[in-house]
Amino acid sequence: MDLFYRESGAGDPIIILHGLFGTSDNWQIIAKKMGETHRIITADLRNHGQSFHSDEFGYGLMAGDVERLIDHLELDQPLIVGHSMGGKVAMRSSFLFPDKISKIISVDMGPKYYPVRHERIINALKSARIADAESRQDVDNQLSELIPQTGERLFLMKNLKRKKEGGFEWKMNLEVIAEKIENLGEAIHSGDIVLTPTLFLRGSESDYILDSDEVEILKHFPNSRIETIEGAGHWVHADKPEELMEAIYDFI
């Protein structure tokens, strides 16, 4: 299997897909908790975490990787939960192989076009001299010049891998992500309509899914609904994990 993945629990299967610059590690607390009632599979998407690097990067390709994971594990119509970029992968999956999926949950990501918001992060990651860094604190100090938010830096630094000869490297395929970043803003194709039951979960403090997006969402996903988790920003699973799990269980 090309994708790196982790499993926990037993029962009806749920696949969890992380967002841009994320890894399956970001969801392990939730995966462990939900593993008490379900079989949870958290995967590293291509060019992220411990999964393979490729010069090709886009939603159709990532959805194809997910389909191969479903086939490899012989999963019977899993629920797919995707955050941000992972939400778009879940949507694309529901278009490409709807018969293999029971439901999808898109966490703070709609089907519309999104302007690229990550230039600052990419510039910070590319400018950091991690190959010569002596410690994670050294990398943190470098990143802080462009990324003042401590939590954001700690999230990004989960991608650091120490080299045997000293210094660090990024687990993610930073060059390809930077080159193909525009692909991640693309909207769902205008004619795509899927009846897969779908939940769009948004954070009340995030602007990724707006009230005005409801018409577009229902156009592509007529069997869907939008719910808001109060007090959560874009990183819903980090801000309000208990409320997120409750919403997932209610939808199941």
Q: Which residue stretches match the model-derived regions?
A:
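Conserved hydrolase catalytic core segment
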Residues: D76-R117
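Alpha/beta-hydrolase fold catalytic core
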Residues: M1-I15, G35-H38, L75-D76, E182, ...
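Catalytic active-site module of serine/aspartate enzymes centered on a nucleophile-bearing elbow/loop
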Residues: S224-I252
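Active-site loop/oxyanion-hole signature of alpha/beta-hydrolase fold enzymes
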Residues: Q28-G35, I41-G82, E246
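Conserved serine/cysteine hydrolase catalytic core
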Residues: E165-H220, R225-T228
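Serine-hydrolase catalytic-loop signature spanning alpha/beta hydrolases and amidase-signature enzymes
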Residues: F21-I29
